[in-house]
A protein has these predicted regions:
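Terminal amphipathic alpha-helical/low-complexity segments used for targeting or macromolecular assembly
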Residues: 1-50, 56, 68, 74, ...
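Residues at the loop-to-beta-strand transition
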Residues: 43-45, 51, 57, 63, ...
């Protein structure tokens, strides 16, 4: 069953791109009849799952958006990019080339490109946040934040399976420790009625 159709509404700057329209209710926010973002062809947005392209976001060329992924605002997926699972690409963020994004949040003017891989850690369920003007060419998974003008070069792999957050900001790296509940100062005793 189809979840969307491609309309005749062309993008103002690129006539090869057309708005989509939901033909069925997908989520509480995406109801039948609502207009979405732009695609170049029906291959850009999977008809299965709850993936959606909204506002002025674009998926074009051979890029694929699927699963429960969301492209919104002015985000762009292009080239042979893959955006899936529960990834959110928003703001003016771009996923391009052969990059794979399977979870996490891309926002600001960030760019995930080349053969980059961004994914949620399956054990901790933590997912990367790429923000600002950060550029990622390597692999990132787990509880990692890249922001500012941070650059993750090709061949670099950041895999954080802890609850602590690794933060790459501009040319600095830091760790934000997860707040932990301190042990009780005195042992707990319970009074039971008899």
């Amino acid at each position: 069953m189809k979840k969307y159709e491609i309309t005749d509404i062309a993008h103002p700057d690129n006539p090869n791109l057309h708005r989509i329209r939901a033909v069925t209710d997908l989520t509480e926010d995406v109801l039948a009849g609502m207009l979405g973002g732009y695609v170049e062809s029906c291959d850009n947005l999977d008809q299965e799952g709850r993936a959606w392209i909204s506002e002025d976001a674009i998926a074009c060329e051979n890029a694929v958006v699927c699963g429960d992924a969301v492209l919104t605002d002015h985000a762009v997926a292009k080239g042979c990019a893959y955006v899936g699972k529960n990834a959110t690409v928003t703001g003016n963020a771009t996923v391009q080339d052969d990059a794979i994004v399977c979870g996490g949040l891309l926002t600001g003017k960030s760019c995930v490109c080349g053969y980059a891989v961004i994914r949620q850690d399956e054990q901790t369920l933590c997912a990367p946040i790429i923000d600002g003007s950060a550029r990622v060419y390597g692999e990132i998974s787990g509880n990692v934040v890249c922001r500012g003008n941070a650059v993750v070069l090709p061949g670099t792999k950041l895999d954080n399976r802890t609850q602590d957050c690794f933060v790459l900001e501009d040319d600095r790296v830091s760790v934000q420790t997860a707040s932990r509940t301190p042990p009780p100062k005195e042992p707990c005793t319970y009074a039971f009625e008899r």
